[in-house]
């Protein structure tokens, strides 16, 4: 009976499809009505209906399969016919639900689903179950991974904490070991050893204090000597005769210095405030060596008394200067709101804050002492360098004094700077002058117009600053002059002391193939000399003028264009012709020699007169020196009057023979100085051949000077 009912349901499945559609439509309508009506909350939703339909279909399918299995043993033919309609169902899907016979009969009677629909539903349910299983497995894997990551992070954090704790423990152990080692290595010293160490420190401090005092005395004496040279103060001859080396020995004895040191710094076992207070006196003592140079000009009696009364007066002068600094808010170590202690540069708003900073940061300690020693070494190095430079300057001045250049008239007055420098040189070389000091003068140079000048505007109206041309005077090659001073001419706005022809020749000779175009010559001028980087129109015109004027420059046409070369033979011939061309010029050479000697003597007299205030005040000028100056003055005026009256004087009309006793090595007169005015000797008679050459060369240079 069960088999027949199953076959009937299968055969009539096509007829009941319409009924199924109507049933589903009714169910949908019911679900819509359930949604629309909010009052009937007991109605079944569409999801529950679908679930119920699936369960019913599954139950029906299971029942059919059971029937087919039971009937398949009896009728294999019917089993073969119904094999395409069988739906494979897994045992996992069959086990969970249990269908009662009554429910199975109701499903069969109602004929809700066809076998095809049942098969489709079973496949869908299998797919859904597979997806659920996959999702569950994926979710489990993710949870396991997250759990593993959390465990790993916790383990890493624990390991890091353990490592940090171990490192801290190791550091603490190392520190403890180091402290123990230090305690073992440095046992408590014996009281006698402590006293010895304190005595050694005190002795070192005393030695350092003595060095500072000696340096301060030297600086004060040097400043006093500078003021004495300039005539600002006067010292009796009894004191001026004292040598400089004996002055620093006029200080305190070692016992007095030690007592003074104890008064300033106190006992060595005092508190830090006392030490800092002692450091204030030290710093003021150190700084007073430089502040005394600035305040001594306004108050020279202070330095004068310091030399007379010894070191005690020096300390009192320093205290006075420090009080003056506090009132005037001026200190050598303080300027523009910044501490000028070496390597400090701390910003201080006012002078009081600077004093606090000076007492706190730069007290008497090892660091400040080391910095002071470094500063002493710096000063010593500078003094050594200064002495070398002074020796070089003295050699240069000696050389220039023995080989003076030809005097060139100019409306400009004498150069005061060179005069002061030569006067200092004469003071240093004079046997009666004061000993040479190793420091530069700190006071400004004052105009030396306190006495009557030997060279007056009425006697020599056209004597000016003398400009030398080394390459033309002594036949020194230009490269030897430019090579040592290459960086100077390259960076300084100073005109090189050479003619344009000499510079052009040097530019061409420095090139690889000994030939340059005009633009290359221009570039050499601007590259080598900073002076020619301005006023290009003026000096370029002069370069073109000299290239076309002189025969030693040859213009050559080649593939590149027009280049300029140098005919060295013509260049040397041109230089030799400038001496032998004019007989009148040769005739005037003795007169020029005499005039040069007279001018050299007059310069010496003027330099001697520039130091007359010092000599007159110190009593070092004797009658013989005054007589010599008067004789030189008369000889100079006589020689100048003779030259003015007879411009073409001969060698027999030269000045007196004692002027020739001055070892003057004079050079022949060269008429190639474009930027220098012509000599007084050549104003009366000069070569007409060279006159045209000079006018052509001086025209562009006059524009350059303007």
From Swiss-Prot:
* Bias type Polar residues, positions: 1-28
Which stretches does UniProt call biased (Low complexity)?
Answer: 287-296
- SMART domains reported in the protein's UniProt record: FH
What segment(s) does the record annotate as region Ctbp1-binding?
Answer: 413-417
Tissue specificity, per the record, is: At stage 15, expressed in the anterior/superior eye field and the caudal branchial arch. At later stages, expression persists in the retina and in the caudal branchial arch. Expressed in the pronephros and the tip of the tail. Beginning with stage 35, expression in the brain is localized to distinct subdomains of the anterior prosencephalon, the medial mesencephalon and to lateral domains of the hindbrain.
| PROSITE patterns tied to this protein | FORK_HEAD_2, FORK_HEAD_3, ZINC_FINGER_C2H2_1
Task: Please state where this protein is localized.
Answer: Nucleus
Where is the stretch described as Leucine-zipper?
379-400
Keyword check for Nucleus: yes
What Gene Ontology molecular-function terms does this entry list? DNA binding; DNA-binding transcription repressor activity, RNA polymerase II-specific; RNA polymerase II cis-regulatory region sequence-specific DNA binding; zinc ion binding
Among the record's GO biological process terms, what is one?
caudate nucleus development
An example Gene Ontology cellular component term from the record?
nucleus
Q: Which residue stretches, if any, does this entry annotate as coiled coil?
A: none
| ZnF C2H2-type span | 337-362
Q: List, as start-end ranges, the regions of compositional bias called Acidic residues.
A: 690-706
Write down the InterPro entries for this protein, in alphabetical order. FH_FOXP1_P2 (IPR047412), Fork_head_dom (IPR001766), FOXP (IPR050998), FOXP-CC (IPR032354), TF_fork_head_CS_2 (IPR030456), WH-like_DNA-bd_sf (IPR036388), WH_DNA-bd_sf (IPR036390)
Q: Which residues bind DNA?
A: 495-585
Q: Does the keyword NAD apply?
A: no
Which keywords fit this entry according to its UniProt record?
Answer: DNA-binding, Metal-binding, Nucleus, Repressor, Transcription, Transcription regulation, Zinc, Zinc-finger
Extract the ranges annotated as region (Disordered).
1-45, 275-305, 672-706
Q: What is its main location?
A: nucleus
Question: What's the record's remark on domains?
Answer: The leucine-zipper is required for dimerization and transcriptional repression.
Q: How does it assemble?
A: Dimerization is required for DNA-binding.
Chain's role: Transcriptional repressor.
Please report the name of this protein according to its UniProt entry.
Forkhead box protein P2
Q: Provide the species name.
A: Xenopus laevis
Tell me the name of the encoding gene: foxp2
């Amino acid at each position: 009976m069960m088999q027949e009912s199953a076959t009937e349901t299968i055969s009539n499945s096509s007829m009941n499809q319409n009924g199924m559609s109507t049933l589903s439509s009714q169910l949908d309508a019911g679900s819509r009505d359930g949604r629309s009506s909010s009052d009937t909350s007991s109605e079944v939703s569409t999801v529950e209906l679908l679930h119920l339909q699936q369960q019913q279909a599954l139950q029906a399918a299971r029942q059919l399969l059971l029937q087919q299995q039971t009937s398949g043993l009896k009728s294999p033919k019917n089993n073969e016919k119904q094999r395409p309609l069988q739906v494979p169902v897994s045992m996992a899907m069959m086990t969970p639900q249990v269908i009662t016979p009554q429910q199975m009969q109701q499903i069969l009677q109602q004929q809700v689903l066809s076998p095809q629909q049942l098969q489709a539903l079973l496949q869908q349910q299998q797919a859904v179950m597979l997806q659920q299983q996959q999702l569950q497995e994926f979710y489990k894997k993710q949870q396991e991974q997250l759990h593993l990551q959390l465990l790993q992070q916790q383990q890493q954090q624990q390991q890091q904490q353990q490592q940090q704790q171990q490192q801290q423990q190791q550091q603490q152990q190392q520190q403890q070991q180091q402290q123990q080692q230090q305690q073992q290595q440095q046992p408590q010293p014996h009281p006698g050893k402590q006293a010895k160490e304190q005595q050694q420190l005190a002795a070192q401090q005393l030695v350092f204090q003595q060095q500072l005092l000696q340096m301060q005395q030297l600086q004060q004496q040097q400043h006093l000597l500078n003021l004495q040279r300039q005539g600002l103060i006067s010292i009796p001859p009894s004191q001026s005769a004292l040598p400089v080396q004996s002055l620093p020995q006029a200080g305190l004895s070692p016992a007095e210095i030690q007592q003074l040191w104890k008064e300033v710094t106190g006992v060595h076992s005092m508190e830090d405030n006392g030490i800092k207070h002692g450091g204030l006196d030290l710093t003021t003592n150190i700084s007073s060596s430089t502040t005394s140079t600035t305040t001594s000009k306004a108050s020279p009696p202070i330095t004068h008394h310091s030399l007379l009364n010894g070191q005690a007066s020096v300390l009192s002068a320093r205290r006075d200067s420090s009080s003056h600094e506090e009132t005037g808010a001026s200190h050598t170590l303080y300027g523009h709101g910044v501490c000028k202690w070496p390597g400090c540069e701390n910003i201080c708003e006012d002078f009081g804050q600077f004093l606090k900073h000076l007492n706190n940061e730069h007290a008497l300690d090892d660091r400040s002492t080391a910095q002071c020693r470094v500063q002493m070494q710096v000063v010593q190095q500078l003094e050594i360098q200064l002495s070398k430079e002074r020796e070089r300057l003295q050699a240069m001045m000696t050389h220039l004094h023995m080989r003076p250049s030809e005097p060139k008239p100019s409306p400009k007055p004498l150069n005061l700077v060179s005069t002061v420098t030569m006067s200092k040189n004469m003071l240093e070389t004079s046997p009666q002058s004061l000993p040479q000091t190793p420091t530069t003068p700190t006071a400004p140079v004052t105009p030396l117009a306190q006495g009557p000048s030997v060279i007056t505007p009425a006697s020599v109206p056209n004597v000016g600053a003398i400009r030398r041309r080394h390459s033309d005077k002594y036949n020194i090659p230009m490269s030897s002059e430019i090579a040592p001073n290459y960086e100077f001419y390259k960076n300084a706005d100073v005109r090189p002391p050479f003619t344009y022809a000499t510079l052009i020749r040097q530019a061409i000779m420095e090139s690889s193939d000994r030939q340059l175009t005009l633009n290359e010559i221009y570039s050499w001028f601007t590259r080598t000399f900073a002076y020619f980087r301005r006023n290009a129109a003026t000096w370029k015109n002069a370069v073109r003028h000299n290239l076309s004027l002189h025969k030693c420059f040859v213009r050559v046409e080649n593939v590149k264009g027009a280049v300029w070369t140098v005919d060295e033979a013509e260049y040397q011939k041109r230089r030799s012709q400038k001496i032998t061309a004019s007989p009148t010029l040769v005739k005037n050479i003795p007169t020029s020699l005499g005039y040069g000697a007279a001018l050299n003597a007059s310069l010496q007299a003027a330099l001697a007169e520039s130091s007359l205030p010092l000599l007159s005040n110190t009593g070092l000028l004797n009658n013989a020196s005054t007589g010599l100056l008067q004789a030189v003055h008369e000889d100079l005026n006589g020689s100048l009057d003779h030259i003015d009256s007879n411009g073409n004087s001969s060698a027999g009309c030269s000045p007196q023979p004692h002027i020739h006793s001055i070892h003057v090595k004079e050079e022949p007169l060269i008429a190639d100085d474009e930027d220098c005015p012509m000599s007084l000797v050549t104003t009366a008679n000069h070569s007409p051949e060279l006159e045209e050459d000079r006018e052509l060369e001086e025209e562009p240079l006059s524009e350059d000077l303007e």
